[in-house]
Amino acid sequence: MSDINATRLPIWGIGCDPCVGDEVTALLTRGEA
């Protein structure tokens, strides 16, 4: 289990970074504004 999780985490982070980053940026922008 740990091996699978350790392998999936980096891939998920890199693969979904753009879409997740956009959502986070939007939330941060709205919060700061």
UniProtKB/Swiss-Prot annotation:
Miscellaneous remark of the record: The typical symptoms of amatoxin poisoning are gastro-intestinal distress beginning 6-12 hours after ingestion, a remission phase lasting 12-24 hours, and progressive loss of liver function culminating in death within 3-5 days. One of the few effective treatments is liver transplantation.
Residues that make up the propeptide removed upon maturation: 1-10, 19-33
Pfam families assigned: Amanitin
Posttranslational mods: Processed by the macrocyclase-peptidase enzyme POPB to yield a toxic cyclic decapeptide. POPB first removes 10 residues from the N-terminus. Conformational trapping of the remaining peptide forces the enzyme to release this intermediate rather than proceed to macrocyclization. The enzyme rebinds the remaining peptide in a different conformation and catalyzes macrocyclization of the N-terminal 8 residues.
Location in chain, cross-link Cyclopeptide (Ile-Pro): I11-P18
Any GO molecular function: toxin activity
Entry's family note: Belongs to the MSDIN fungal toxin family.
Role according to the record: Toxin belonging to the bicyclic octapeptides amatoxins that acts by binding non-competitively to RNA polymerase II and greatly slowing the elongation of transcripts from target promoters.
Protein name (record): Beta-amanitin proprotein
Signal peptide per UniProt: none
